[in-house]
Curated annotation (Swiss-Prot):
Disulfide bonds: none annotated. This is UPF0319 protein YccT. Keywords: Signal. Residues 1-20 form the signal peptide. The lineage of its organism: Bacteria, Pseudomonadati, Pseudomonadota, Gammaproteobacteria, Enterobacterales. It comes from Salmonella schwarzengrund (strain CVM19633).
Amino acid sequence: MKTGALTTFLALCLPVTVFATTLRLSNEVDLLVLDGKKVSSSLLRGAESIELENGPHQLVFRVEKTIRLPGNEERLYISPPLVISFDTQLINQVNFQLPRLENEREASHFNAAPRLALLDGDAMPIPVKLDILAITSTAKVVDYEIETERYNKSAKRASLPQFATMMADDSTLLSDVSELDTVPPQSQTLTEQRLKYWFRLADPQTRHHFLQWAEKQPPS
């Protein structure tokens, strides 16, 4: 897809639905999956927030933070993947509140019994269900989307069954053939649909930065 066409395509993807909840992102949180869908890290890189519809949501993420070691050394701490589910029906903003994580002892405690809070726009706690996402795959590269689907089918603490089958068949994401001048390979069409989905969720500033980047890309 040529850059100009890509820009027009994304501009037309702006949602007609008015989103009512802003999820404020944290530079210490690596978002992996949102509501059963793998997060497009390239599109959300540098984004400050994501716009969500009111209702139930589920995040899969890792906490990443530099911690101190003895001898004034430092290392990057990366937590196990965590699952958190919550409802934004009457909430207009969601903010992460992480516990103190400054050293190996605190990191070990967090690994064993993770705890964190989500706060609304008035800094009031949002009811959440938090769990560790146990990885069943032995592959070097983990498909967190598939692992999340398994988790949601297992009736665990933070499971949301409505997100268990959303990604079971990628064909459900494909647009009607009438929207396309020609029928591209399924993988290409799916890539466009995923890009469209994450573009819709990105905040206006991130959309603007992405469109600026897209304009500078050479035509394929």
